[in-house]
Amino acid sequence: MIANSWTRSEYYRIKAILDEKIPTRMDLFKMMNVPQYLSCIEKSRENIFKQYLDTLEEMGELDAEELVLKNDVGGEFLHVLETTLMQKTYKMVILKAFFNNGNIKMALTEKDILDVWKDFFAEGDNWKDLGVESYQDFLGITDEQHLTNARKNPIKHLLLSGQGFFVERPGYEIALAEELKDVVKSDILIKHFGDIIEYRISEYFRKKSF
């Protein structure tokens, strides 16, 4: 069993508040009581956020289309996104560039990465994750320095540890494997892709605030 009793109780409480709509990861993140949330993420095997589709299936909450996705390459891809190691937000920024506001790109150019990277780190205090002392120092980083950072950190590690879903492609900085070209058009995958990115960034900053 993945979800412990506290997590299940919270899930159904939040689902009732949402008029019986299946909660997203972000719904749960925002609405779970703190003790229950911390209990949920304390042990990997009980952390529903690292295996949300499996959790929904276990609880009888997965619809037929999501079940097909879960048992196919799309489900494997989403699980990689849920579980990839994350010491900083860098990987999530690259994933945001792929996500492209719901119009998923199969490959990223320098410009694709720079646009999302600079926008993300210019927002609020996100620039602090780059290890600079001030916002002015952030503004002084050149495009080539940003790209070097992206290449040697998130891009390198996604290529190495992305279970083959992230690949090199001539003329691009990084690409998705061809086996994903059809599934990335799925509204269900798009929904979960965006939800995972938003949750993982939110959880990262929650942890960092303590």
Whereabouts are the PLM-identified features?
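Intrinsically disordered, charged low-complexity linkers and terminal tails
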Residues: 1-210
